[in-house]
């Protein structure tokens, strides 16, 4: 097989990008597909393999086995490697990376010029792209004369000036001020609609605004995939649950409930997908912090972190002795780990008896009246109707 495969325009019937390869030194084995015109987010904890995926697609890394394909063409394998400068792939990262000695318009024109476009045509294209990102009046400024948001706009114009087949976004908003990021996010959403995009981010706002689909990676493997709505509605890992803004509680199926390792029973609304839901199978519950009420435990029997004996299960039908008497609800003894005030609301993080953590979002006034502090014994109460139960995939 040749070292440099044909880089001509691809057939539209193939996915825009495919990773079906392994990098042994990083213990990464990825199987990812990006449909043409779709925007895919890759999310996961640090060291999960996200940067490796971008490096494989960009041409900065060659796989040890398997293939990297762009629109059906093999551009990376143990025997084949199309170098980065010959791939129609562009990257937009945290830092704009503009050439300091060139004006904004010359930075944008640099890509087309490097691909053989004549200077006048390249400058015309550059000015068009600058106008499209709202920077037409900044064409003659050098990078040091631009604000962070302006520089990132110019970097986007530069990326799109070469009409790329694939756009890689590596946390492009992470270095921007919170006042600037929303405008750049809207701009990216507008300019990248209909293009093939691979996005790496830790921000759920980026998922909703900039992605159609998402894959969750951990330890170099894909652990979950689907549309953004599907994955965030049914997170299968702690990382995905944090992105979705919910707590994830794991356990074993016990009839129609979930039995945690610490002895608590979790009752909720079971997924309509019955496959995998059977006694003894692993399952997860998702809990929205806004649905969790916090009550001070007036007579704690011991730390939920280190119970002195096997705890008795608690469930909506068998409430804790200290739980409020109400309609069917879950009630779980817990220990407050941290409080995060944010204006009128406070996020309370508490550990169940097996160490699993559940968040509750309550008013800051309530937190003060309850005299909550790390180490406080509480009862977490949440309606069964507000807990979603899923078989563990």
Region spans (language model):
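ABC ATPase NBD coupling module
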Residues: 75-90, 114, 231, 235
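Helix-to-loop junction immediately C-terminal to a conserved catalytic motif
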Residues: 58
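Internal alpha/beta loop-helix hairpins
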Residues: 189, 201-264, 298
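A short, proline-enriched helix->beta-strand linker immediately N-terminal to the Walker B motif
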Residues: 161-165
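Glycine/charge-rich catalytic "coupling/switch" loops of P-loop NTPases
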Residues: 264-340, 364-393
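Conserved ABC ATPase signature
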Residues: 142-146, 150
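Conserved ABC ATPase "signature" region
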Residues: 120-138
